[in-house]
């Protein structure tokens, strides 16, 4: 019985071994996303476009992708409706770390090729130009990289209710 338990333990331990997933924080892709976010904060749409593949698929809380033109229009509307816009990360009362960014490279598994994704977490803080109300949205954005070093898929996950309400106010005032 002891030998059987030992065999099961060794088998379990071996099955939990490293599967070649690599997580980095200060790599080329993570740093490119930090620059990408600075371009967003500076309302530099041309700078943002430099990192996007022309065929990028952008998903905003949905499995249905929106067009790059629609996405750029939304980003421009954010800057028209809010000032300032900040991206922060950290414990309340602690040091602001900016945006938390990490890149994960997954090995090929079965029919799936290897892939590299950069994940980011932050609080999107913005003050509405019309209402003067400051909103804080916890956000997660994931970026999938193509072989050419461009972003081919972008996944946005956050509650947009307050943001969209403020943008609607902005449009009513026009």
Each language-model region and where it sits:
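Sec-dependent N-terminal signal peptides
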Residues: 4-13
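C-terminal and inter-domain tail/linker signature
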Residues: 16-174
